[in-house]
């Protein structure tokens, strides 16, 4: 999918979710899960390096986003948004290491996790799309947050609200 179309799709969906700066990644995931009719479970885990930083696994009862525990909060948010990008771009979940998942996530199918952890680069179109979605969301949040910092009031906050309504999700 072209970047322009991804931007339109993100803008449309995220406006429906009524998310505003400052960006709360957990709240965004909660709202996307509500819209999809099943929760999104965020799980921090010390994922071995080299390897992926995150993985999305869809099950009948919930979507799971596993993300690297051993990194900064900003990087964790980006990882989560990348995996959320797979959902928002309409990708299917990959379905990985039996022992790892059996111990940590007994209700997940080991085959599902094994396939998901094989995604380690942005070489495929789906990985680039997911990364683009994460970037679109972070760009939007950072641009509007700079216009009116989180703790600003009065004219600066009104200007940011005005821009958010006009520009939407960039």
Sequence positions of predicted segments:
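Active-site scaffold of zinc-dependent metalloenzymes
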Residues: 38-77, 84-90
């Amino acid at each position: 999918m072209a970047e322009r179309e991804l931007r339109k799709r993100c803008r449309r969906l995220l406006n429906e979710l009524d998310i505003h700066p400052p960006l709360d990644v957990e709240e965004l995931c909660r709202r996307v899960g509500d819209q999809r009719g099943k929760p999104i479970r965020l799980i921090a885990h010390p994922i071995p390096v080299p390897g992926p930083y995150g993985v999305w696994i869809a099950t009948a009862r919930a979507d799971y986003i596993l993300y690297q525990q051993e990194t900064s909060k900003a990087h964790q948010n980006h990882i989560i948004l990348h995996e959320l990008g797979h959902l928002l771009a309409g990708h299917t979940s990959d379905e990985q290491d039996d022992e790892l998942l059996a111990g940590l996530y007994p209700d997940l199918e080991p085959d599902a996790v094994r396939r998901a952890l094989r995604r380690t680069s942005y070489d495929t179109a789906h990985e680039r799309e997911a990364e683009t979605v994460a970037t679109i969301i972070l760009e939007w949040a950072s641009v509007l947050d700079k216009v009116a910092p989180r703790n600003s009031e009065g004219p600066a906050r009104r200007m940011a609200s005005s821009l958010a309504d006009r520009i939407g999700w960039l």
